[in-house]
Amino acid sequence: MQNNGRPMTAIPGPSVMPDRVLQAMHQPAPDIYGGRLEAMTEVIVRDLKAVARTQHDVALYISNGHGVWEASLVNVINQGDKVLSLASGRFGSGWADVAKKLGADVQLLDYGVHEAFDAEQLAAILADDKEHKIKALTTTHVDTSSSIKYDIPQIRKILDDVGHPALLMVDCIASLGCDRFEMDAWGVDVMIAACQKGLMTPPGMAFIFFNEKAKQAHANLTQVSPYWDWHPRTNPQVFY
């Protein structure tokens, strides 16, 4: 498909970049030791938090979405921790697979590609976990492969109603910038996103948003990956 002579690829992502984004790329790389890049980063962080509707932290990575699947997990779980994963498509199950390869004890609830999660089943599983062995619940907001959108506030309500402290972790790679997402109002503890879909910029960057509860989980880790560690990315001693 073409519009005014420029090819338009109508796929979920990488999405078509606006002309002003393409024009902004036609400039030399900035001095990484100068103030311009640091000032730009401050604006990017501010605007990302506005899109995610959060007052909490965001860590920026040179990565694709699969990278922040891993990064988000290694910042909050130890090997052997139990993770409950909801999936209605290949990306929900893909995140679960990464958790499993990192050594987590993963329970995958796979609902196929035609249905969202079963609220009664989810509530029963969480209520049965009396010892709170489940440390995190992972899910997509929208799974690209199936287009199924999950009701994130409902998942938060289920967690709260049964009094379960598991971290609520949400993949918004396909939805951030396309649909409303209220990280703070919906009680999401960790959210991941990338730049090439709803944010309509070139592929290559991904983001983890996390709140105080997630910070506490991070503080309790026995080990964290030095590259993926979000702490130096949000509290740098120097900018480089």
What function would you assign to each model-found segment?
Residues 1-34:
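N-terminal "arm"/small-domain region of PLP-dependent enzymes with the aminotransferase-like
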Residues 16-17, 196-240:
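Active-site C-terminal subdomain of aminotransferase-like
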Residues 24-71, 94-100:
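Conserved N-terminal alpha-helix of the aminotransferase class I/II PLP-enzyme fold
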Residues 77-93:
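Conserved PLP-anchoring active-site segment centered on the Schiff-base-forming lysine
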Residues 94-105, 112, 123:
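Active-site-proximal loop->helix
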Residues 117-176, 190, 198:
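Active-site phosphate-binding strand-loop segment of PLP-dependent enzymes
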Residues 184-196:
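Conserved active-site segment immediately N-terminal to the catalytic lysine
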